[in-house]
Every structure is written in C-alpha cells, then in structure tokens.
C-alpha cells in the first residue's frame, strides 16, 4: 500500500490503531476494522481496551466483544465535532448481549444516522462467514428525538428496502435485526377509528 500511494499526500502508518493517541482530528473516518473474536484478544490488551472505553465513553463493555467494537467506540478522538464516521463491520452486535454497549454508544454518545445491512448471502468479508453492515454516525450530541435510516439488501446507495425508525424505538428494541425482518414499521398511529366513527357496543341478540 505504501508503494501504491507513494508520491501522494496520503500518509501511511503501520501501527496499532487502538494504541495510538490522536494528534490530529479529521472531518471523516472510514474504517473496516479487523474481525477478531474476543478469544484471540490477549487478556491484558482486553483489560486496557475496556478501561479506555469506560474512560472515553462512560460505558462498560463486555469482555465478549469482538475487536471491531473497541474500534468503533474509541474512534471519536480522531473526529472533529460534526465529523462523519462510516464503518463496515459484522452485524451481530445488533442482536448479541455484548452488543448492548455498542448500541448504547450509538444512541447516547453520537448521532446515529444510518445502518445498512447486507443480506446473509452477500458476504463482504472474504475470510469470515458473517453477515455485515455499514454503520454511519456523526460526532455530535444526538437530538432528543431523531430518526435513523435502516436499509437492507443491494447497496447502501441503492438498497432494496428503506425504513426510518425513531431512536426511542431502537432503545426499546433488544434485537435490532428484528427491525429489518418484519414489515414496514409504523412508529406512530396517524389516525384511529375514533377519528372517523363513534365506536360503541351494539344490541346483544338473545339478551332477554
């Protein structure tokens, strides 16, 4: 990669991203972190990363979390306020217990904008048989009542299905993939029968 980009303004650093301290902040971060399960993270490294997550986000993360979770939750130091962050990661965090910390971070610490989920047979990792998703968020305080775009299938720019879901509904949903699997979601009733009719019990036949 260094040879390919030689002669450009791109600076290549070969280092442990999670051990670096941000010496500069950027408007955008695009990442595809390594998919490494917790079994393969050294104990001392895991403890250090858990401490860093708690220190930077105020959130306790499970020791069962994969390495990509730490990447997402420790990335804000590299972003300017209002900066955008885009991640290609496994989608399992949306349903498993260790993903609670990641989902809390996305709803509480940043402004979650969009999650695109690839279909199960559309693998994005050549060396890992996992379903994938793209997560986009902004480094900003989330609005009190904002909406998140959920898309599935196809590409992020040309998905098969598009849904808009309120953040409050996400907070109440344990398994976010349920929001992809069911039919269109009606988050608020636009009208009820009572808006058009007077509803009352009719005459009960045989009541004599």
Language model: regions and residue ranges:
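Signature of N6-adenine DNA methyltransferases within the class I
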Residues: 1-207
